[in-house]
A protein has these predicted regions:
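Positively charged, phosphate-engaging catalytic surfaces used for nucleic-acid and nucleotide handling
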Residues: 1-149
Length: 149
């Protein structure tokens, strides 16, 4: 839920909504902007259900700044020996995001994580059939040829 609050603040969509609406086998790199072995490596099934992998560089930078700012805020409160219930912790996120003039997620979002994962994996199954596979052998040959020229 915490992650969704930040994703929603930056994109207007929860993590599941980002994955569900962005995973598309017909798009270059299946709609991903980054993945474990990017930019030249193979896209893995585990890459396609990570919402952050679909965000633009600008959105990633905003997300990182916002999360970092929130952690600084919480660390300051903890150093002053404030304690929180989970409900208070959740509300503190809303207060922080509201102060930063972001929209606040109400509820859990429209798409479940299970539905997003199911769609992303179905898209990946078809996309994976078209992925170009470069073997280690081919990669080594290419490097050797480059050295000899």
């Amino acid at each position: 839920m915490v992650q969704n609050k930040f994703h929603y603040a930056i994109t207007g969509r929860t993590a599941a909504e980002i994955v569900f609406t962005s995973a598309d086998r017909s798009k270059e790199h299946m709609g991903l902007t980054t993945w474990k072995n990017s930019p030249d490596g193979r896209i893995l099934k585990s890459d396609v259900n990570v919402a952050k992998n679909y965000l633009s560089q600008k959105q990633i930078a905003q997300l990182e700044r916002t999360v970092s700012g929130y952690f600084d805020y919480i660390e300051d409160l903890i150093e002053r020996e404030n304690t929180f219930t989970m409900e208070e912790f959740s509300e503190s996120i809303n207060e922080f995001l509201s102060f930063r003039r972001y929209d606040i997620l109400k509820g859990k979002g429209k798409i479940s994580n299970a539905a997003a994962t199911k769609k992303a994996h179905a898209e990946y199954k078809e996309f994976n059939k078209t992925q170009k596979i470069v073997s280690d052998f081919d990669r080594e040959i290419k490097q050797l040829k480059a050295k000899n020229t």
